[in-house]
């Protein structure tokens, strides 16, 4: 049999002249090993955050049954078993769309931050009530129509007396609790 010349494929009209490497580059998306490890570590961290949630908070997160059972098991076990279980949860999270889970976690965190902001606003309002006069009381009554002016004035007066006499701030706390109850009922 005759040996074909090395440039034979250039002479053959049926041969596709495009290099094979270019075709493969279009189809294959190359991901580095480090990136895969970073993604796995991020999923493990997400799994740890899920394990740290309470049962009521877990109900608000969209999880399948197998993942939820694994999280509940991880909450029960200790030390090395917990680490292995979190690793397993990370593996399960690879097969699940993580975006809805992350969104639910963000909502839970933001809700907590919003509650803290409301408490800070109430503390500022309490301080303004004690330091201010009738204008601040009118502002509170306008903000919370079900507020009792007489009770507000009594709590403010008692808080001022306690502050002047250097007594424990019982009325100070009662005033805050009253404002908190008003904000929750509004």
Curated annotation (Swiss-Prot):
GO cellular component terms, A-Z: cytosol
Protein function: Member of a network of 50S ribosomal subunit biogenesis factors which assembles along the 30S-50S interface, preventing incorrect 23S rRNA structures from forming. Promotes peptidyl transferase center (PTC) maturation.
Entry keyword set: Cytoplasm, Ribosome biogenesis, RNA-binding, rRNA-binding
GO MF, one example: ribosome binding
Protein name: Dual-action ribosomal maturation protein DarP
Keyword RNA-binding: yes
InterPro entries associated with the record: DarP, DarP_sf
Subcellular location(s) of the protein: Cytoplasm
Protein encoded by which gene: darP
GO biological process terms, semicolon-separated: assembly of large subunit precursor of preribosome
High-level lineage: Bacteria, Pseudomonadati, Pseudomonadota, Gammaproteobacteria, Enterobacterales
Protein family membership: Belongs to the DarP family.
Major localization class: cytoplasm
SUPFAM superfamilies in the cross-refs: PSPTO4464-like
NCBIfam families registered for this protein in UniProt: PRK05255.1-1
Classification via HAMAP family: DarP
Family annotation (Pfam families): DarP
């Amino acid at each position: 049999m005759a040996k074909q010349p090395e440039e034979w494929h250039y002479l053959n009209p049926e041969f596709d002249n495009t290099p094979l490497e270019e075709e493969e580059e279009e189809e294959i998306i190359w991901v580095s090993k480090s990136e895969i490890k970073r993604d796995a570590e991020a999923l493990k961290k997400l799994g740890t955050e899920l394990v740290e949630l309470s049962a009521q908070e877990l109900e608000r997160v969209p999880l399948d049954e197998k993942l939820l059972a694994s999280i509940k098991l991880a909450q029960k076990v200790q030390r090395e078993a917990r680490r292995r279980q979190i690793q397993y949860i990370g593996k399960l999270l690879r097969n699940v769309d993580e975006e809805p889970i992350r969104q639910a976690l963000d909502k839970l965190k933001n809700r907590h931050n919003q509650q803290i902001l409301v408490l800070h606003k109430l503390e500022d309002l309490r301080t303004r009530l004690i330091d201010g006069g009738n204008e601040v009381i009118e502002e509170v009554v306008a903000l919370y129509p079900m507020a009792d002016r007489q009770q507000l004035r009594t709590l403010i007066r008692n808080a001022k007396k306690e502050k002047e006499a250097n007594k424990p701030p019982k009325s100070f706390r009662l005033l805050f609790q009253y404002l908190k109850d008003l904000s929750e009922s509004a």
